[in-house]
A protein has these predicted regions:
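Walker A/P-loop
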Residues: 47-84
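C-terminal engagement/docking regions of AAA+ P-loop ATPases
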Residues: 2-12, 16, 68, 251-330
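Loop/turn-to-beta-strand initiation segments
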Residues: 51-53, 77, 113-117, 131, ...
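Pre-Walker A (pre-P-loop) alpha-helix and adjacent loop at the N terminus of AAA/AAA+ ATPase modules
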Residues: 15-61, 249
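Canonical AAA+ ATPase core
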Residues: 99-104, 125, 137-234, 274-276
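P-loop (Walker A) phosphate-binding loop of NTP-binding proteins
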Residues: 58, 92, 160
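Walker B catalytic acidic pair
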Residues: 57, 120-121, 132
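Conserved alpha-helical scaffold flanking the Walker A/P-loop in AAA+ ATPase domains
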Residues: 42-45, 98-118, 147
Length: 330
């Protein structure tokens, strides 16, 4: 793995090469993870938008393996924090440590000082520790004893969580949820995918040794930077901007919701649609780009009424209904 504070000079970093490299991520990650292509795409979109990702799924669906495979294929430094009920904020961000030899305090960086932080089972720790990530995610720095310390670039938090109905979980605060650009749901595999998983393990696949599985770096920070520059130049028409606003405003008027999408959420949807448009080979955004990213970008930014939940309404069903109702620009 590379030093997270340095650029990777081994990659050309021009937009055309960057797109090809990022597209090849799927093939590399598929060497370790069967299926889950939408989640892979979501992680790449988040990197392009300098955003963070929340991965939700039952235990055992390869959430952690997916993030580790992405880090290996991108040649990024990665660290993992297992969130537990007794985890302290300083265990994540770092702390001042007294050195008896010099009689001085020195800063010991926590695992947050990396390119890709895997926050495993983030909803198994109390809100105080969950909130220790807030400044890091929003400001891309950590302040300890009044001194701000910048985090490396790129920096992405990929947090995994179990569904809230599982015992021993603490629902993420709204302020924390809003810091995630995307919420990706990891489904159980199809029958054929599950057969493929078992076959790989029977043939000796070791999820702890991705190099042996053939996962190799195919892109680096220079490619990401070139891609981000190209995404920022992706054209957005006034009609597309209006379409995004109309979708988000419709959530605020939905009778099934107590909380709709904020302007920050609308900004996030436009950003992810631009990244998706660029990834698919266009330099302009179309309505289908907005639709493609609406669910992962918005599902964690709305709140259902209790009576709607009792009737079986879900966040995804509300968003899908809104997408079907809001006029699409021509």
């Amino acid at each position: 793995m590379m030093d997270p504070t340095t650029d990777n000079a081994g990659y050309a970093g021009d937009p055309g090469t960057a797109r090809t490299s990022l597209e090849s991520l799927r093939a590399e990650i598929a060497k370790a993870v069967v299926g889950q292509d939408p989640a892979v795409t979501g992680l790449v979109v988040a990197l392009l938008c300098r955003g963070h990702v929340l991965l939700e799924g039952v235990p055992g669906v390869a959430k952690t393996l997916l993030v580790r495979a992405l880090a290996s294929a991108l040649d990024l430094d990665t660290k993992r924090v297992q969130f537990t009920p007794d985890l302290m904020p300083s265990d994540v961000t770092g702390s001042l440590v007294y050195d008896a030899r010099t009689a001085e305090f020195s800063f010991q960086p926590g695992p947050v000082f990396t390119n890709l932080l895997l926050a495993d089972e983030i909803n198994r720790t109390p809100p105080k520790t969950q909130s220790s990530l807030l400044e890091a995610m929003e400001e891309r720095q950590v302040t300890v004893d009044g001194t701000p310390r910048p985090l490396p670039d790129p920096f992405l938090v990929a947090a995994t969580q179990n569904p809230v109905e599982y015992e021993g979980t603490y629902p993420l605060p709204e302020a924390q949820l809003d810091r995630f650009l995307l919420k990706l749901t990891i489904p159980l595999p199809s029958r054929q995918d599950e057969i493929d998983v078992l076959t790989r393990h029977a043939e000796g696949f070791n999820p702890r040794d991705l190099r042996a599985a053939g996962v190799r770096p195919v892109a680096g920070p220079a490619d990401l930077e070139a891609a981000r520059t190209a995404v920022a130049k992706t054209a957005v028409s006034p009609e597309i901007t209006g379409y995004v606003v109309d979708i988000c405003r419709a959530t605020r008027e939905s009778p099934s919701l107590t909380l709709g999408v904020s302007p920050r959420g609308a900004t996030a949807l436009l950003a992810t649609a631009r990244a998706w448009a660029w990834l698919t080979g266009r330099d302009y955004v179309i309505p289908d780009d907005v639709k493609a990213l609406a669910l992962p970008t918005l599902r964690h930014r709305i709140q259902l009424r209790p009576e709607a939940e009792m009737e079986g309404v879900t966040a995804d069903s509300v968003i899908n209904a809104i997408l079907a109702h809001v006029p699409v620009p021509r």
